UniProtKB/Swiss-Prot annotation:
Keywords: Cell inner membrane, Cell membrane, Membrane, Transmembrane, Transmembrane helix. The chain crosses the membrane at residues 10-30, 50-70, 72-92, 118-138, 148-168. Plays a role in cell envelope biogenesis, maintenance of cell envelope integrity and membrane homeostasis. It comes from the Bacteria. This is Inner membrane-spanning protein YciB.
């Protein structure tokens, strides 16, 4: 249920874009992200930091898109969010408080050097995705960018997540692997 809720704003953005335009879709994205927060709070009695950050970013960049009638703001939002993720992960690793380890380290027990590799891998991933987003957003058609944002970046993130879990699992001790099964 939680994962479906995470995709709600993206699905609504895409559907509204296909029937209307980028501006109505941007407004729908703001509303859907707010709805996501409300549903998340009602179901889980708490709000995740990532959802709050996403809501603020969507609201700011979506509103600028609507007010100035300029789709470049909603396009930049993707790159800025990825840049923030990369910075947060990189800084947390440099300060020896890796975010990924703090989120997953209780279930997936591996050496700190493995967490460092995974963290820098994700930093690189977010930087590359942010740069590719800039290229697609400003060099190709708006429709191509929307499809890339919805399907391309989502697929890349899911593939990256699977690869990360496989890598972490491979680097776990045999005993810890058995405990997960």
């Amino acid at each position: 249920m939680k994962q479906l809720l995470d995709f709600l704003p993206l699905v609504i953005f895409f559907a509204v874009y296909k029937f209307f335009d980028i501006y109505i879709a941007s407004g729908a994205l703001i509303a859907a992200t707010a709805l996501q927060l409300v549903i998340s709070y009602l179901l889980y009695k708490k709000l995740e930091k990532m959802h709050l950050i996403t809501f603020v970013m969507v609201t700011v960049f979506g509103s600028l898109t609507l007010i100035l009638h300029d789709d470049s703001f909603i396009k930049w939002k993707v790159t800025i969010v990825y840049a923030l993720f990369a910075i947060a992960l990189g800084v947390s690793q440099i300060m020896n408080k890796p975010l990924l380890k703090s989120m997953l380290g209780k279930e997936l027990i591996v050496e700190d050097k493995i967490w460092a590799r995974v963290t820098w891998y994700w930093v690189s991933f977010f930087v590359v995705c942010g740069l590719v987003n800039i290229y697609v957003a400003f060099s190709l058609s708006q429709e191509t960018w929307v499809n890339f944002k919805v399907f391309g970046l989502t697929a890349l993130t899911l593939i990256n997540t699977v690869l990360t879990v496989v890598y972490l699992f491979k680097n776990m001790s045999e005993e810890d692997r058995k405990e997960l099964k």
